């Protein structure tokens, strides 16, 4: 029997290499990670994809294995919680912003390395302006365990709507990540996105 290969339509699958930026002047190419003389801080490469799967959307991140990422992933993947939590962006976090095209309403999904997650609902850009943001109850997130590869880590999750199919071709989105390496003895946020705004 021949294998069935799914044929993707142009709006069914997108993959990006995320670009790293920081708002800190402490970050430059001479900085060394955690004072390790042999390990200059070069931001790990992160690739992200978003794909249509039946009635849901799949989001995945590949994080390059470096001394820094190996340290954080190996520590946190041992204690996977798989529960909702707020303020995940204050530590290493992977995010997907998803909205219907031509709509100001959107959801923000957050996933931490330890399995904590959340989905927030916004009526417009950061509206309502409250902390923590309003939890979204119309979507669910199903998370796969983090895959450990020779050269990196893969985080994957699915976003589903309770009452209707999500169609990626009808959506606008942004995939982002935040890592917090130690630079000059302080945690510094490094922001990743394929589209920084």
What are the residue ranges of the model-derived segments?
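Order/disorder boundary and secretion-linked terminal/linker segments
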Residues: 1-76
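Acidic/polar low-complexity flexible segments
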Residues: 2-14, 85-106, 169-197
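Beta-strand secondary-structure signal
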Residues: 47-49, 58-62, 95, 154-158, ...
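Beta-strand elements of well-folded, non-transmembrane domains
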Residues: 52, 63-67, 100, 159-163, ...
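Soluble secreted/lumenal catalytic domains
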Residues: 67-69, 90, 164-169
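Short Gly/aromatic-enriched secondary-structure transition segments
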Residues: 73-85
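Localized edge beta-strand/strand-to-loop motifs within extracellular or lumenal beta-rich domains
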Residues: 149-166
């Amino acid at each position: 029997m021949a294998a069935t290969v799914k044929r993707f339509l142009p709006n069914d699958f997108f993959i990006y290499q995320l670009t790293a930026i920081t708002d800190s002047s402490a970050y430059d190419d001479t900085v060394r990670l955690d004072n390790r003389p042999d390990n200059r801080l070069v931001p790990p490469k992160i690739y992200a994809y978003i794909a249509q799967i039946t009635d849901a959307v799949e989001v995945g991140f590949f994080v390059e294995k470096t001394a820094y990422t190996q340290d954080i992933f190996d520590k946190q993947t041992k204690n996977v919680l798989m529960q909702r939590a707020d303020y995940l962006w204050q530590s290493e976090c992977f995010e997907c912003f998803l909205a219907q095209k031509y709509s100001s309403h959107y959801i923000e999904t957050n996933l931490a390395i330890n399995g904590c997650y959340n989905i927030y609902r916004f009526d417009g850009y950061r509206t309502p302006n409250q902390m923590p943001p309003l939890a979204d109850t119309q979507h669910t997130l199903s998370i796969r365990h983090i895959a450990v590869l020779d050269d990196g880590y893969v985080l994957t999750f699915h976003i589903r709507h309770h009452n209707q199919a999500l169609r990626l071709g009808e959506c606008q989105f942004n995939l982002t990540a935040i890592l917090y390496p130690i630079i000059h003895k302080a945690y510094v946020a490094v922001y990743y996105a394929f589209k920084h705004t």
